[in-house]
């Protein structure tokens, strides 16, 4: 019995170390995993004006709440997340929610091709917003939309804004 409890405690410690290790990586490569408030997610979905069948990519998808909200609107959703624990957590949530249009890939967001996305959602720390703006403007098709939570892009006025959520459109 004591051996079993000791093994559980050791396993929990390993999982915590694993999680915090990937959190540190995320901090230095984009943003720490901070879940968006449900009110922010609702504003993001309103501004995105998602139509059934559109492709949404969430860069830094965390626990998948944006993916699940967009899938309810009919979007085909792809989450990009570097933390494997959050990838599996999102996959489990999607399965339990019967959200078959949600998939998640464990990879670095800077390596992802976003050219097929109709909508990209982000919640990124300010120091990476300029680099991300350049990537999205270079790769996304004209007319596609970007929804940024909390931090706007520098030197790019949003098309629309609702509180701390910003809508950008790739020009035609």
Locate the predicted segments by residue:
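S-adenosyl-L-methionine
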Residues: 1-51
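Conserved class I S-adenosyl-L-methionine
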Residues: 53-62
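Conserved SAM-binding loop of SAM-dependent methyltransferases across substrates and taxa
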Residues: 63-75
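Conserved SAM-binding motif I beta-strand of class I
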Residues: 76-81
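Conserved SAM-binding loop
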Residues: 90-91
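Conserved SAM-binding strand-loop segment of SAM-dependent methyltransferases
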Residues: 98-109
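A short SAM/SAH-binding and catalytic strip from SAM-dependent methyltransferases
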Residues: 115-131
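C-terminal substrate-binding/active-site "lid" region of AdoMet-derived donor-dependent transferases
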Residues: 127-172
């Amino acid at each position: 019995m004591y051996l079993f409890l000791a093994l559980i405690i050791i396993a929990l410690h390993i999982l915590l170390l694993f999680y915090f290790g990937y959190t540190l990586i995320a901090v230095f490569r984009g943003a720490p995993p901070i879940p968006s408030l449900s009110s922010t997610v609702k504003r993001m979905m309103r501004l995105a004006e998602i139509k059934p069948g559109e492709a949404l990519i969430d860069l830094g998808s965390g626990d998948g709440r944006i993916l699940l909200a967009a899938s309810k609107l009919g979007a085909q959703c792809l989450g990009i997340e570097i933390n494997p624990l959050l990838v599996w957590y999102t996959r489990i949530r999607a399965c339990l929610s019967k959200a078959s249009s949600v998939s998640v890939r464990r990879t670095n967001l800077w390596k992802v091709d976003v050219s097929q996305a109709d909508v990209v959602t982000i919640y990124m720390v300010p120091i990476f917003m300029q680099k991300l703006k350049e990537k999205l403007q270079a790769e996304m098709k004209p007319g596609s939309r970007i929804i940024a939570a909390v931090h706007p892009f520098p030197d790019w006025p949003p098309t629309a804004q609702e509180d701390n959520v910003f809508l950008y459109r790739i020009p035609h």
